[in-house]
Structure formats: structure tokens, C-alpha cells
């Protein structure tokens, strides 16, 4: 059974159902939150109950659809929200205001901004609320279906490129890879971006045999070149690596060893399995290839460069901002100090690590303080990795590498 971050029932196009997996409760509790309105979408995005740039864009778009359908089903609600359904210009103006509000939930991720720009265009070209409803439904269905298809394509593109590169470099045998944050099914419509490449690498390692003959550059009797271990970084301070990526790897039975962010240099130096690549996602890639991603990504890129490990960013075309020239212009979101000073998780028995249940027989969530409550905290959600530290950008259109001058040519995607 595949993991689902978003449950979208589209069987009734005029009465869709949207539920979002509360990722703050993972890995011990699986609970879905209904999304009926833009306010609901804003809340689950802002609170990081859903995260990952593609998933944020999907949930944001779906929340507009559910609000539009809710308005048509409940005229009383429309009055409470100050919509005048008898005046299309009023509805149009109000929706534009609501879309701007939704955009403020997570300003760094470009996917949400791109999707909302598309939706503004659909709104301006709609004759009434019913027309907008129909067009928006088609848009979100395409958004979700394309995201999944692109993820699978990116997974194969990245896996094949790495394996071919390793053979060209003269490497043969088993290897491991690094990743940070969560870029899998929980961050997308399914399969994942960077974790999708890792899934594809694992699938290829499992299927190696007569149907996958060795490359001409490989020695005839050499061990096959295959990924056998993943090293996900914990990803402080929100622990997406330990809570979510480790959860997905265990679910898919992909061999993995969880490490803290500060262990990566020593792990690379001492690992009996050579670590040959790092795959990370992106919340925004600008024109020159500079990449905004989860805090700690830049640090990982520096370490990889020191050890000669290939560093890849994996993201669809929708994550590329072809207007902003460099990472210096990216607005980096800063989170609340309490998210740093406190750790939220499931209360467990000290001896056997089983979850402690509340009165409803559900795992009990708890917050634990790990820093003085009055200490100053700096808590950026993202950092910017300069393109000089990136070996390749994996997209659904192929793998982009730098030219002889050290520049990416991402404009070829547009």
C-alpha cells in the first residue's frame, strides 16, 4: 500500500472531498484532516501539517476548489464570508484577496506561487462561479496527475544518470546515498522527487540480472554497480528526515541508516559502503541554479564537495523560478523560535519505546523543551545552496549539468 499525503476524491466533480495527512503526528499516528476552505488550506500549510513544495501547491489549489464548491452548496456560508454570489465581480475580487492570503502561508516555495498565478488566470477567464468551478477542477486534476507522472520520470532520469556516471568514473560495486528532509510520497502526489530517485535506484538494484546486462565499460566479472544503503539526515529542527523520510524508507523496505545532521562528515569518512551521491529536493530553483531547500542543505553540499561526492537537486519544472536571477533575491521564511526550543513527538514507554496511549487509546503527543525558554533563537526554514556546489539538476525533462563556464542553462526548459 502506497503512502498518501493527500486524499482527493474526485468521483463527483462538483462535490470533491479533500483530506490531508497530519504529518506532525507521524510516525506513530495516522490522522487525516478535512480541507473545506481556503482557511483550512492555509492552516495545514502554515502549521506544516502538510509540507513539501509540490504537496503545498496541490493542497493550496484544492483548498480554493473546495471553498468554491462549498459556496455553491451553502449560500449562508457565502454571506458569512462576505461573498455576494449575485455579483460575479464581487466574487472575483474576494477570491483574489483570498488567494493572496493563501500565498502568505509559505512564501519561499515557488510551486504554490506558480499554481496560484495559474488559478488567477483561470479566474479572470471565467464567466461565473460555476464556470470557474469546472475549469479549476480540471486544473487541479491535471496538476496532481502530472506531478505523479513527472516524479516517476525524474526518478528514472536521476537513477540512470548516476549509474552511468559512476561507470564512466570507473566505479563498480555497491554504494550508498545521502538525502535530507523529506522528498517522497509525503511531500508530493506520490513517489517523490529526490526520494523518487532513491526509489528508482533501489528498484534497479533489485532487478539487476539478465534483464539489466552490465555496461560495456564494466568488467565482465565485476560486481554490479548498485545502491544498497540510504543515509537520511535527521533534519533539525523539524526532524522531517527522522519522522518522515525514515518512515517512508521503512515502509518501502529500502535499507537505511538514520544519522543526525552533524554526523554526515564522519559517516562519509568511515562508512564501509562508499557514499557516492546526495539527492535533495528544492522549494525554489532560480535562473542561475541557486537552490532554496530545507535548512541544512547548503551544509550538506559543502561536505559533499569536500569529499568529492556528487550532489544533485531533484525537482520538476514547476519548482524553477526563471525570473529571479540568483539566490540573493529569494525570500527565506523564518519560523517561530518555539519550533526550535521545543521538540514535538509521541510520548513513548522508556523501556520498550512503545507509544503511550491517551484516554481515546491513541498515541499521545507531547512537547519537550530542549533549550532555555528565554534564549534568543534564529530559525530560518530554508537555506540557499549556490549553484557552484550542485553537480546536476534532475527534472522530468532530463538532467541539467553546468557548461564549460560553470553555468546551468535552465532557460532551455522554458
From Swiss-Prot:
Catalytic-site annotation from UniProt: 283
Molecular-function GO term, any one: S-methyl-5-thioribose-1-phosphate isomerase activity
GO cellular component annotations of the record: cytoplasm; nucleus
EC category: isomerase
Site features described as Transition state stabilizer, chain residue numbers: 181
Pathway the protein acts in: Amino-acid biosynthesis; L-methionine biosynthesis via salvage pathway; L-methionine from S-methyl-5-thio-alpha-D-ribose 1-phosphate: step 1/6
Catalytic activity, reaction form: 5-(methylsulfanyl)-alpha-D-ribose 1-phosphate = 5-(methylsulfanyl)-D-ribulose 1-phosphate
Enzyme Commission code(s) on record: 5.3.1.23
InterPro entries: IF-2B-related (IPR000649), IF-M1Pi (IPR005251), IF_2B-like_C (IPR042529), Initiation_fac_2B_a/b/d (IPR011559), M1Pi_N (IPR027363), NagB/RpiA_transferase-like (IPR037171)
GO biological process, one term: L-methionine salvage from methylthioadenosine
Function: Catalyzes the interconversion of methylthioribose-1-phosphate (MTR-1-P) into methylthioribulose-1-phosphate (MTRu-1-P).
UniProt xrefs under HAMAP family: Salvage_MtnA (MF_01678)
Protein name, UniProt field: Methylthioribose-1-phosphate isomerase
Species per Swiss-Prot/TrEMBL record: Zygosaccharomyces rouxii (strain ATCC 2623 / CBS 732 / NBRC 1130 / NCYC 568 / NRRL Y-229)
